[in-house]
Amino acid sequence: SMSDLGVTITNFGDEYFEWKTRSGNTARINFIKFTEKTSPGGYLQYDCVRENFALKPKNSNDNKIVAASSGTGFFISKQGHIVTNQHVIDNCSSVKVNFYGKEYDTQVISSDKMNDLAIIKTNMNPEKVFSIETEDASLLEDVIIAGYPLGKKVSASIKTSKGSVTALAGYGDNFSEFQTDAAMNKGNSGGPIINQKGNIVGVAVAAYGKKQGVESFNFGIKASTLKTFVTSNGLEFLPSNKKELSNKDLGN
């Protein structure tokens, strides 16, 4: 199912980690689910898709809290490679994946700050992984964003939103991104944007701040940018599906 294809990443950042000498700077990931990180975003005029909330570390008698935020990652290889946003794992000294209650160590394979992409690897071998579309999404093409908006505050179940591609460039005419009106909220960072064939057409990256009174200004990193990043790291991806799927099949 779609919920088997992604991960939750938790990153406790240096700025707020007050137990650093005792428990270290750790990121924890639970499968597709959301990712959690700390430091504020540096995106021009739009807010990085993340949330801030208080998180108390396990096995701590200290009443201090750690600030965290959330995002999403997804598998692209059966060797356990996971794609997410670079800002999700930024400033993280260790990353662990929790899959059906079992925790796995991970390794950061590559990080691209300019395109906000990262690849991490677990020692798991997932049965299903995402394929990447051969061409970038077209204007008005239907897309689905999957992930964990608001993290686990709502539920541990994967959530989806549906919309279309509304522009072929991102903020400031960034042609490595596209714009969509599919709902994107805090916790969607790094999540897959898929088409009706079930292929990846983008990676959720940012939403224009609603404080500016603007709705549906959400952005995804294009499939072509993702493919270049993946192949430049010596990885292959699955051939794209050619046939459109029903909504039921997409969910399964």
Predicted regions and their residues:
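Surface-exposed, beta-sheet-biased, low-hydrophobicity segments with strongly acidic/polar composition
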Residues: S1-L55
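Conserved hydrophobic positions within beta-strands
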Residues: F31, G73-F75, T106-V108, V165
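Short, solvent-exposed secondary-structure boundary/capping segments
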Residues: K37-V49, D116-T122, D173-D181, V214
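C-terminal cap/linker of serine protease catalytic domains
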Residues: K56-N63, T106, E127-K128, P149-K153, ...
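Short, small/polar residue-rich loop motifs at catalytic or cofactor-binding pockets
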Residues: A68-S70, N91, N185-S189
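Short, acidic, Ser/Thr-enriched surface-loop or helix-capping motifs
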Residues: S77, T160, N195
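Conserved active-site neighborhood of the chymotrypsin/trypsin-like protease fold
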Residues: K78-S155, D173-E177, G234-N247
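Catalytic nucleophile loop of clan PA
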Residues: A183-A204
